[in-house]
Amino acid sequence: MPTVLRVGRYRFFFFSNESEEPAHIHVKAGGDEAKFWLEPVVLAVSYGFNSRELSELEELVMNHRSEFLEAWNEYFS
């Protein structure tokens, strides 16, 4: 489960067995978790985060999208 980025309490990562899915990033903080598709950036699923946190996470994903895609492509190619 490669961690790509940490920002505050948020950890951005993907699972090493998810190469068959489109590029995406998971975000975890404590017991809360979300998954964002990267092309385009869209929330796929969320458990525990409130709407304010999801807005913040979406902005972080958009700001680091190229970094996440680069990590994804390097890992799975």
Please report, for each region that a protein language model flagged, where it lies by residue.
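Negatively charged, low-complexity tracts enriched in Asp/Glu with abundant Ser/Thr
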Residues: M1-R9
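Generic preference for hydrophobic/aromatic residues in regular secondary structure cores
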Residues: V4, L43-V45, H64
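Intrinsically disordered, low-complexity segments enriched in small/polar residues
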Residues: G8, V45-Y47, N73
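Feature detects long, helix-prone N-terminal segments enriched in hydrophobes
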Residues: R11-F13
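A short, structured beta-strand/loop element
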Residues: F15-S51
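C-terminal structural segments of small proteins and small subunits
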Residues: F49-S77
